[in-house]
Design a protein with these regions (language model features):
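N-terminal beta-strand motif that seeds the catalytic metal site of vicinal oxygen chelate
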Residues: 1-20, 74-79, 126
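Vicinal oxygen chelate
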Residues: 2, 34, 88, 92-126
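Core segments of cupin and vicinal oxygen chelate
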Residues: 10-53
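A short, acidic/glycine-rich surface segment
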Residues: 32, 40, 60-66
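Exposed loop/turn and edge beta-strand positions of beta-sandwich/beta-sheet ligand-binding modules
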Residues: 40, 73, 106
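Short, charged/polar surface micro-motifs in flexible loops or helix N-caps
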Residues: 49-53, 60-62, 84
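Conserved beta-strand in the GNAT
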Residues: 54-56, 121
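Mid-chain, well-packed structural core segment of small domains
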Residues: 70-91
């Protein structure tokens, strides 16, 4: 039997299409599924064949129930990439600002905030 693994993370965003497009551009992911969600909302699953991020928005576009407010208790989403410099160039080209760069054993990393204020850590162990 294999070890347990995270299959997906579900986050609430104002515009799932915008966030999905950003993730497709930055991480070369694809949309696995898109459709209606609870409470009259809409969800997009974007990722790879092995894992994904579910992007949820409520029934009223831009209106997020307080129980799903961003950042509570989520700290950040970590994404491992092979080429940190190329990914950072795509982050900058998307108009986002990388910050908190660090080289540490065993890898390198930086962070950025998406348009919803969700923090991402991008790390490479290559």
């Amino acid at each position: 039997m294999s070890s347990p693994r995270i299959e997906h993370v579900n986050i609430t965003v104002a515009d799932p299409e915008r966030t999905s497009g950003l993730m497709e551009t930055l991480f070369d992911w694809h949309v696995r599924w898109s459709g209606p969600a609870q409470n009259g909302g809409h969800t997009i699953h974007v990722g790879s064949e092995d894992h994904y991020v579910a992007l949820y928005t409520g029934g009223d576009a831009g209106q997020v129930a307080d129980v799903f407010a961003k950042g509570r208790p989520l700290n950040h989403i970590g994404v491992e990439v092979d080429d940190l410099d190329a990914t950072e160039a795509r982050v900058i080209a998307a108009g986002l600002r990388p910050f908190s760069h660090a080289d540490y054993e065993p890898g390198r990393r930086f962070y950025f905030l998406d348009p919803d204020g969700i923090e991402y850590e991008v790390v490479s162990y290559a």
